């Protein structure tokens, strides 16, 4: 939990709201020359988010404060999360309920690990991949995985969302190694209508 409210940051001209240092998309604070990143300023209390923000700050520190054309922005569109339990849980993007609440016309596919050769060989009866896409455009809206190596299996889905690949492009635009567990992602993609 951020403790920015305890830093007395206002003394340096740094604005704080709800216990967090306020930053813009370049990670700049309200005080000229002062950047912030990680738990002190981000609503995402995740190390990989802080790593991303650190790369943004590292680049932007070398730019003139007003030269936003040379700066890079922090991209928080598709922040993934993983829980390293047994089984692992990983997620990125919208849940089915969130997509419905936004009034989106969606397609949902739940694929069991045991439906692919690797999952069958592991005798996996609980692992699943759940994908949510926008019907019509095929745009991936969310991915949720529970099972062995969920934190690794979700990575290509994060990439697809970040780079704007549709479910069909991702499913058919590359080779999927057989027999390997990522085939469960391929089959989920192919099962979307």
What are these regions (language model features)?
Residues 79, 84-193:
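Flexible, glycine-rich terminal cap/loop adjacent to redox cofactors
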Residues 28-29, 33, 75-76, 122-123:
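Solvent-exposed alpha-helices and their adjacent loops that cap or buttress functional pockets
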Residues 24-28, 51-52, 64-70, 138-140, ...:
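Short C-terminal domain-edge/linker segments immediately following a structured domain
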Residues 43-51, 59-98:
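Rossmann-like dinucleotide-binding cores of NAD(P)H-dependent redox enzymes
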Residues 1-68:
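FAD-site-proximal beta/loop scaffold in flavoenzymes
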Residues 3-8, 72-75, 112:
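Alpha-helix initiation/capping motif
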